[in-house]
A protein has these predicted regions:
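Membrane-water interface segments that mark the loop-to-transmembrane alpha-helix transition
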Residues: 8-56, 70-71, 239-261
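Helix-loop junctions and terminal segments of transmembrane helices
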Residues: 8-24, 94, 210, 214-238, ...
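Hydrophobic alpha-helical transmembrane segments
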Residues: 69, 73, 102-151, 321-326, ...
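Membrane-interface junctions at transmembrane-helix termini in multi-pass inner-membrane proteins
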Residues: 80-104, 292-319
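Interhelical loop/hinge segments that connect adjacent transmembrane helices in multipass membrane
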Residues: 128, 132, 143-186, 236-244, ...
Length: 369
């Protein structure tokens, strides 16, 4: 994930936005695709040089020794495939090609799993690590084929070019990606440390268990957001049309996630037995709190994609900082009182308040002249 963000300069949501916005303007679309290609090529090449030239310190930092310099240099090449694969997927999302995007991911993952197995058999532990990077990188193969077959854009559009205005707009998404990679991950690290200090690492494991199940099904549910919601909102310019789309999305998303969450709650004992072990049975008491938070978190995602679609860096930073602050405030209040249960309660309380704030800000924006 980190490689994908850094190699592609974090611009993929921006690519989807501007492709959707200019899908019926060939001249502007060519500028978007060409500038995106140049940025991806530049950042991925820079990453490759850093990995090749600094292989020894990177190996030391990641593995505690310098024995993996060869692996680091191979990953320097593989990350270029990750970047280009993500760029091609972002282009398809801009055209709302859900089928092409899904097929590319499925076929690419199957090829990647085979490559992982071969790498593991040939290289053991180092081969397995390389194989993990190959899985997302090899998506580039079916993505290229799918883009050619769909014919949405000529491959000549991918020739790197440069437009200062577009590069500046896309750079906003680089900042967004960097902010996202810092705020919530740091908040969760701090929550884990607080929980371990107040109680034990066993409590951390209980909370992490329910969080991992939550993340798994939420990824499945929100996968369609970047394929449908982001390009759709990017194409809309009238406040009335945007409002209608947001309300329609909320009317679909909230009941769907509530139904999925209720199903997970009903099957919580089976999920613990299937995915974890009897040591995690205490986790069952956390599900209700976590799942309520999940429903409202996904509801807030709808507003988040509106912010991304309009490339509003100011509101994006405000949203990320708000989530971080709310998590920290509720965590320091509830974790000392209730342990792992308090962590789940802090998560739920955060997204009750955050979703309410999103609704309030949206209503104010809608009523502005």
């Amino acid at each position: 994930t980190v490689l994908g963000v850094l190699a592609g300069a974090g611009i993929f949501n921006g690519v989807t936005k501007y492709v959707a916005q200019y899908h019926d303007n060939p001249q502007q679309l060519r500028r978007v695709v060409g500038t995106s290609s140049a940025m991806v090529l530049g950042f991925s090449t820079l990453m490759a040089l850093v990995f090749v030239l600094a292989a020894a310190p990177i190996s030391q930092g990641l593995f505690g020794n310098t024995d993996y310099q060869g692996l680091v240099r191979l990953v320097a090449l593989v990350q270029m495939g990750i970047a280009w694969g993500n760029l091609l997927l972002a282009l398809m999302k801009g055209f709302r090609d859900a089928a092409g995007n899904a097929l590319s991911l499925i076929v690419g993952s199957l090829i990647g799993v085979f490559a992982y197995y071969v790498s593991y058999r040939l290289g053991g532990y180092e081969g397995a690590l390389l194989g993990l990077a190959l899985i997302p990188a090899l998506v580039v193969i079916p993505a290229v084929i799918m883009l050619i077959k769909r014919g949405a854009i000529p491959l000549s559009y991918l020739k790197p070019s440069w437009d200062n205005g577009l590069a500046g707009q896309l750079s906003k998404f680089t900042l967004m990606a960097l902010i996202t990679s810092v705020t919530l991950p740091v908040a969760y690290i701090m929550m884990r440390k607080l929980l371990a200090a107040q109680y034990s690492w066993d409590e951390v494991g209980i909370w992490q268990g329910v969080s991992s199940i939550s993340d798994a099904y939420l990824q499945f549910i929100t996968a369609s957001f970047s394929v449908y919601l982001l390009p759709t909102l990017s194409r809309l310019t009238e406040k009335r049309d945007i409002t209608r789309e947001v309300v329609k999305s909320l009317k679909f998303v909230l009941p769907a996630v509530a139904a999925a969450s209720f199903t997970v709650w009903l099957l919580r004992d089976f999920a613990i037995w299937l995915l974890l072990s009897n040591k995690f049975t205490a986790m069952r008491d956390l599900f209700a709190w976590q799942l309520v938070g999940d429903v409202l978190k996904v509801g807030a995602y709808v507003f988040g994609y509106l912010v991304i679609a309009k490339a509003s860096l100011r509101f994006y930073i405000l949203a990320e900082v708000s989530q971080f602050t709310l998590l920290m405030v509720f965590a320091h209040w509830l974790i000392p009182a209730h342990g792992a249960l308090g962590a789940a309660q802090a998560y739920m309380a955060t997204y009750i308040v955050y979703f309410s704030l999103c609704c309030g800000v949206f209503l104010l924006w809608r009523r502005r002249a």
